[in-house]
Amino acid sequence: MKVDVLLGLQWGDEGKGKVVDVLTPRYDVVARFQGGPNAGHTLEFEGQKYVLRSIPSGIFQGNKVNIIGNGVVLDPALFKAEAEALEASGHPLKERLHISKKAHLILPTHRILDAAYEAAKGDAKVGTTGKGIGPTYTDKVSRNGVRVGDILHNFEEVYGKAKARHEQILKSLNYEYDITELEKQWLEGIEYLKQFHLVDSEHEINNLLKSGKSVLCEGAQGTMLDVDFGSYPFVTSSNTICAGACTGLGIGPNKIGNVYGIMKAYCTRVGAGPFPTELFDETGKKIRDLGHEYGAVTGRERRCGWIDLVALKYSIMVNGVTQLIMMKSDVLDDFETIKACVAYKVNGEEIDYFPYDISEGLEPVYAELPGWKTDMTKMTSEDEFPEEFNAYVTFLEEQLETPIKIVSVGPDRGQTIERYTEE
């Protein structure tokens, strides 16, 4: 068996949580391979809205194994709150959620360091979520991290050394803080974590594949936030692309099957950083309001703009995407004209590729298509799609040279329409 990978192609918030929940009935296992509680997946299930930060979205399917891989960074306090809320709403976890012992822990001092570093940057700040993600990955790469497996052996010693090291850094930054309540909740989270299956997930997932089980790998955030291929330095601290599934779960590249790339019918971004198609007018505000574009974790307003096909082509290339999934098509139901960026203009020269630096002097070149002016939220089949919407989809497929297999026309899992485009 091979694993299929589901990931975002833009700046995150593409709707991965809903899609993975729609796809999970086809798989035996759902595995999260990177990121931390900075990324929130919003799902609607049986009339209730859930935001998952660390737990894989397959948790709503009662018979699935869910794995948090080694590439994930885990905050025990936030994990405990998330897990307890799910269990209270009738979704038991302890037998179905397996956590890699090699996953790194976000410490209370990582969160303090995150705030201190951002404060020190002033106007040059990246706009982090303040969840300690960057400092945790920094410790991981510098071989100073604390891993989930450490809570089983010599934990107080390992944690004490890491905490002391962080306190020295904070002292040098002259940053005032009070860790008391954060640490109390965190230590309670550590005890809670011990109740779960802590596993060598690389062995588990490969053994599951050998036994014929089907696996869906779930990414967080989006390709344009990848630490290597995103709009650096305004990126996250992990590899969000398909290759991250290999390093974040311990599977070989030859085990990758389908790569599902998720995109919105338009584009959004949270926080600082370049965004070529960003709209600062009433159109951008209209997209934000109709799409309810506010961060699932932070509540921050998302910046909104037209779809960027130059960036999407780049994302499809670096991920090896085999099928596209387009989310929030219904948000554009009320527009007379839809725009799509097909090139960039830099210093008067038109380019159709994603450049090294997109931060300054870049102007989007748009193609315009007629809007469909139809309520798509009640549609259940592609046969009901208006002619103008079909034309928009066909245009995107031709530009991106990749089939759009699934179209979402609303937030509920039932508002998901599969297409049968010939490959």
Curated annotation (Swiss-Prot):
InterPro entries in the record: Adenylosuccin_syn_GTP-bd, Adenylosuccin_syn_Lys_AS, Adenylosuccinate_synth_dom1, Adenylosuccinate_synth_dom2, Adenylosuccinate_synth_dom3, Adenylosuccinate_synthetase, P-loop_NTPase
Recite the UniProt cofactor note for this protein. Answer: Binds 1 Mg(2+) ion per subunit.
Task: Say which domain of life the source belongs to.
Answer: Bacteria
Single biological process term from Gene Ontology: 'de novo' AMP biosynthetic process
Mind listing the GO molecular function terms for this protein?
adenylosuccinate synthase activity; GTP binding; magnesium ion binding
The UniProt annotation places IMP binding at: 13-16, 38-41, 129, 143, 221, 236, 300
Required co-factor(s) are:
Mg(2+)
Sites binding substrate sit at 296-302
Q: What's its catalytic activity?
A: IMP + L-aspartate + GTP = N(6)-(1,2-dicarboxyethyl)-AMP + GDP + phosphate + 2 H(+)
Which residue positions are annotated as catalytic?
13 (proton acceptor), 41 (proton donor)
List ligand-binding residues for GTP: 12-18, 40-42, 302, 328-330, 408-410
**What pathway annotation does it carry?**
Purine metabolism; AMP biosynthesis via de novo pathway; AMP from IMP: step 1/2
As for subcellular location, the record says: Cytoplasm
Q: Which GO terms describe its cellular component?
A: cytoplasm
Keywords linked to the UniProt accession? Cytoplasm, GTP-binding, Ligase, Magnesium, Metal-binding, Nucleotide-binding, Purine biosynthesis
Q: Which residues bind Mg(2+)?
A: 13, 40
Enzyme Commission (EC) number: 6.3.4.4
**Subunit structure of this entry?**
Homodimer.
Q: What family is reported? A: Belongs to the adenylosuccinate synthetase family.
Q: What job does the chain carry out?
A: Plays an important role in the de novo pathway of purine nucleotide biosynthesis. Catalyzes the first committed step in the biosynthesis of AMP from IMP.
NCBIfam families documented for this protein: PRK01117.1 (NF002223), purA (TIGR00184)
Question: Which PANTHER family does the record match to this protein?
Answer: ADENYLOSUCCINATE SYNTHETASE (PTHR11846:SF0)
What name does UniProt use for this protein?
A: Adenylosuccinate synthetase
User: Source species, please?
Assistant: Phocaeicola vulgatus (strain ATCC 8482 / DSM 1447 / JCM 5826 / CCUG 4940 / NBRC 14291 / NCTC 11154) (Bacteroides vulgatus)
The lineage, from the top, is: Bacteria, Pseudomonadati, Bacteroidota, Bacteroidia, Bacteroidales
The gene name on file is: purA
